[in-house]
A protein has these predicted regions:
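Long extracytoplasmic/lumenal interhelical loops at the membrane interface
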Residues: 335-395, 414-419
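Transmembrane signal-anchor hairpin modules in multi-pass inner-membrane enzymes, especially those
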Residues: 1-131, 168-171, 175, 241, ...
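Hydrophobic transmembrane alpha-helices and their immediate junctions
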Residues: 394-440
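Aromatic-anchored transmembrane helix interface
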Residues: 85-94, 114-124, 136-161, 181
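Transmembrane alpha-helices of multi-pass inner-membrane enzymes
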Residues: 234-237, 295, 409, 431-473
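Hydrophobic core segments of transmembrane alpha-helices in multi-pass, intramembrane catalytic enzymes
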Residues: 40-47, 85-95, 144-156, 226-244, ...
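A membrane-periplasm/extracellular boundary helix in multi-pass inner-membrane enzymes
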Residues: 186, 192-196, 270, 287-336, ...
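Alpha-helical transmembrane segments of multi-pass inner-membrane proteins
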Residues: 46-51, 120-124, 128, 154, ...
Length: 473
């Protein structure tokens, strides 16, 4: 029916319907009794508009997801160990975007995607044993943790095979991620120096100094080791980028140098020795990959860390003295008192090894993913602080084998991209390959599978590197 055929009265009512609804909505907000009630009335339309805007372009949900993931703290809601975070809601929007644009996905399933699927399947396979040995409530929490890890896998799949707007520049999005990372590291430095009130769900990690007690730098993450691992990731990027031509990197060299100092300073404030070891392992890998003199790479990395150490010495001298004493004692007592150097990890590993020796059948399927810290089934509540041992006990040989296979696929995919003729793929491939080599070293002293706040960033770089390696040079 043409507009002319519609009676004038109906056209007038239709034209007035939307303005009238907006007016009534505005009046309801104005007359609402309190600020929270006003927010409740205003939120649904504003949220719907934001979701609609996000879905208009393929990359928008991902950009919003990373901003919320890295730059917002958890909400002070008493649910779980660390409160509730808003980033999974953005991941749900991303899932909706993927469903809407289903026809734009690449249909080929590469072997690395299958490796991710096998590992998630192994985690899910352990959940019935979590319910059997530790109760259904703990099994439900373990299922949620598998879901958090699955978010990182979805980000990887999106970067690898998801919809992409024509003319998309991976280096431009890398620059965006880099800036977001710098903001997160800057906040971590400010948080440590000024000791802001801790966000909900933070770990109680402190450094005892002669003139007081300081909370280790955690930034907007849940604990200090996550921050240290995150800073190590971008510090490796700075090192890789400084060895490549300007046209192949996302930022100018002076900017990379300044950012490297920020990440190195935040890394020192996190008080994480394992993250420094990861950076050194990544540098050795980079030197071997580029067939460069290892001294050149290590000298540049050491210079950056020394400058950052000088900044720490200037602003927080008592912390610097304690930090260097800790490093010195780590070398001095490594053979004399290894359990003390490893902050009790050796005793924990011995306990878990004894548990598997006494109950070898649990080494097949495990006792349930992420049950060790919350269940006394192994004798007492334990934090393994070792990704490999934790997976062996909690998911059995099946889970550990799937995880090792996944790591092999990650290294193989990163190495193939690093050797690509596509300069973007080569840069991203060198970055993720070298970092993941260091990551596998750091896994010996931490359960890095649970770092769901930072794994999506790592897997986006991995997926983009592999995708760019298959694109024309």
């Amino acid at each position: 029916m043409s507009p002319a055929a519609v009676p004038a009265g109906k056209r007038l009512r239709a034209d007035l319907a939307i303005p009238a609804a907006l007016g009534l909505w505005s009046a309801a907000i104005a007359l609402a009794p309190g600020p929270w009630f006003k927010i409740a009335l205003a939120a649904p339309p504003a949220t719907a508009a934001a979701i609609w805007w996000t879905l208009l372009r393929p990359h928008r949900w991902l950009a919003a997801f990373f901003v919320f993931l890295l730059l917002t703290p958890p909400l002070p809601i008493p649910l779980g160990d660390s409160g509730v975070h808003t980033a999974p809601l953005l991941a749900a929007v991303g899932l909706l975007a993927g469903l809407i644009r289903m026809k734009e996905w690449r249909t080929t399933v590469p072997p690395i995607a299958q490796a991710f699927g096998w590992f998630i399947g192994a985690l899910l396979l352990s959940l019935p044993f979590a319910a059997l040995y530790s109760g259904p409530d703990l099994a439900e929490r373990s299922l949620l943790r598998v879901g958090l890890f699955a978010i990182s896998v979805y980000v990887f799949l999106w970067a690898l095979s998801g919809p992409r707007q024509p003319g998309t520049d991976s280096l431009r999005f890398t620059r965006f991620l880099f800036v977001v990372g710098i903001l997160a590291a800057l906040f971590a430095c400010a948080d440590f120096y000024f000791q802001f009130p801790a966000p909900a769900g933070y770990e109680q990690q402190f450094v005892w100094l002669d003139d007081g007690v300081l909370r280790r730098a955690q930034g907007l993450f849940y604990e200090a080791s996550t921050l240290g691992n995150f800073c190590a990731f971008f510090l490796v990027m700075c090192i890789v980028a400084l060895l490549r031509p300007r046209r192949e990197i996302p930022c100018p060299r002076p900017f990379l140098g300044i950012a490297g100092l920020i990440f190195a300073t935040a890394l020192l404030f996190s008080y994480s020795r394992a993250s420094i070891v990861a950076v050194l392992a990544a540098c050795v890998t980079l030197a071997a990959l580029r067939r460069a003199r290892i001294g050149r790479v290590l000298a540049g990395s050491a210079a950056g860390l020394l400058i950052a150490a000088a900044l720490v010495q200037y602003f927080v001298p008592s912390f610097a003295a304690t930090y260097w004493a800790r490093i010195e004692n780590s070398f001095a007592f490594a053979l004399v008192a290894p359990n003390g150097v490893l902050t009790g990890r050796l005793a924990t590993w011995t306990t878990l090894a004894a548990f598997l020796t006494d109950h070898p059948w649990h080494a097949i399927f495990g006792i349930g993913f992420k049950t060790l810290p919350y269940s006394k089934f192994a004798g007492t509540e334990l934090v393994a602080d070792n990704t490999y041992l934790s997976l062996l006990v909690e998911t059995g040989v099946i889970g550990l084998t799937a995880f090792l296979f996944l790591n092999w696929r990650i290294l193989r995919g990163g190495l193939a991209a690093a050797r690509s003729q596509n300069p973007r793929a080569a840069f991203l491939g060198q970055w993720i390959f070298c970092f993941w080599a260091g990551e596998m070293v750091q896994m010996l002293s931490g359960d890095l599978v649970t770092y769901w706040r930072v794994l999506p960033v790592y897997f986006w770089v991995l997926g983009t590197a592999i995708r760019e390696a298959g694109a024309p040079s």
